[in-house]
Amino acid sequence: MQLLKASDIISHLQIDGIFPGGNAIPCTHLNNYMNIKEKQLMNTIADVQSSRDLRNLPINQVGIKDLRFPITLQTAEGIQSTIARLTMTVYLPAEQKGTHMSRFVALMEQYSEALDFAQLHRLTAEMVALLDSRAGKISVSFPFFRKKTAPVSGIQSLLDYDVCLTGEMKDGAYGHSMKVMIPVTSLCPCSKEISQYGAHNQRSHVTVSLTADAEVGIEEVIDYVEAQASCQLYGLLKRPDEKYVTEKAYENPKFVEDMVRDVATSLIADKRIKSFVVESENFESIHNHSAYAYIAYP
């Protein structure tokens, strides 16, 4: 019997929208199709992971972690390319020895759509079907770039933000969440009040994790946070801009407590958002430790 290569198997997995090209195979029939092809392989090659396990312990999540992969993003401001780190896992029943590790990468190798929440839903559903599981989770972490305009000179430059999109499916029910880390400037109100000359200020990382009933854009979360900071950050500033941001921060001092409360107030006002966590870490310029605050809602 002629052996089938893995690429021969994958070439038949033409799922509309995920595996484009050729004849589409309905997702509901995918696992039966995979089983037929795998039986041909197993006639010659032992398939240890498909054997039974006798320890009677299911595994909540098993799969691959930190797969680096190029992706394109569909956002409110257009399409951009970036490099993502993916963690892809599925539920493994007690009687099954192992999952099909190669299928996670095979799925991504065939994926070519611009990623948004709708595509993440489809990708998660296809993974669960491909791995013949009842539950699965995909987390996609990546640097997100936004073009910013300096406040005085008008010069433009890019600023990066850390983003993680997560899709999770269990027994047919799907949910997604988003996490965004926004770097900003904070200036200490106490230092301003007691000092004759200036006040200590520093970079802060504000992290927002949220779930929503309707899609909330990455850019919207960034805007919520930057509006509450002592001042925004910019990739490139000229001297007039530097003067502006220094004075802007001085006129808008914020404790770490102020930061999380003000951001939380903005998020609560957005009725699309069901739940969130806001964290702020201020890298104190006068200490060798950070100031930190955390709010969870509801």
Swiss-Prot record:
Q: Which UniProt keywords apply?
A: Hydrolase
GO biological process per UniProt: tetrahydrofolate biosynthetic process
> Catalytic activity annotated for this protein?
GTP + H2O = 7,8-dihydroneopterin 3'-triphosphate + formate + H(+)
Is Glycoprotein one of the keywords UniProt gives this record? Answer: no
GO-annotated molecular function: GTP cyclohydrolase I activity
Q: Where is this site: May be catalytically important?
A: C188
Report the sequence similarity comment from the record.
Belongs to the GTP cyclohydrolase IV family.
Identification of the protein by name: GTP cyclohydrolase FolE2
Q: What is the lineage of its organism?
A: Bacteria, Pseudomonadati, Pseudomonadota, Betaproteobacteria, Neisseriales
